Amino acid sequence: MRALLMAGLVFGLATAASAQTADLKVGDQAPNFKLQATDGKTYQLSDFKGKHAVVLAWFPAAFTRGCTIECKSLAENGDKIKMYDMNYFMISVDPIEKNTEFAKATSVTLGQGANAQVVEKKEADFPILSDPTKETAKAYGVLMEQGFATRWTFYIGKDGKILAIDKTVKPATSAEDMAAKLGELKVDPATRP
């Protein structure tokens, strides 16, 4: 019975993910957004058009295992990504207060009791965007039925069009994988400090 319930849950999650894919695909214009970030600024995708590529790394929830590991990878290996002429953001449907606390955390305790594990990480040196209304998540097709975003990364060109969508993000190697994808997509090298 337990196996049947687990199979149902996995199927349900897979179905929810596919049901929420919107119709975005490579070559489509990326939906604009105007969202608050953990650095105190508000970012709008249209502000980057004609200037820089943009990478949006959607994640389910701050302070969870995979999201903490992904943030750690991006904070510790961000120099690999910064070799390219683009701006990158992590983004979730968490409120700005929670994402700000997450960005500043240098250690996160995952699990409870005897199974608790402390993950040490650097403070995020990049903005984390908050989409508490979930409108941007819906526009990008990442909102799950459970109310959180799925872990997908969108690569957006200077022209505002989607260059690639990574639906198989590996949190531990997120920065390295992102840098490799930017190279593969032939995103211009960085010309600014």
Residue ranges and their predicted role:
Residues 123-127, 145-154:
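Structural micro-motif
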Residues 68-122, 134-138:
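Structural microenvironment flanking redox-active thiols in thiol-disulfide oxidoreductases
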Residues 18-46:
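N-terminal "domain-start" segment that seeds a small globular fold
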Residues 44-68, 72-74:
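Short active-site neighborhood of thiol/selenol oxidoreductases, capturing the structured segment around
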Residues 4-14:
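Bacterial N-terminal signal peptides
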Residues 46-48, 142, 168:
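Residue-level structural signal for beta-strand termini and adjacent loop
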Residues 148-193:
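Thiol-/selenol-based redox modules, centered on thioredoxin-like
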Residues 39-41, 133, 159:
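Residue-level recognition of short loop/turn positions
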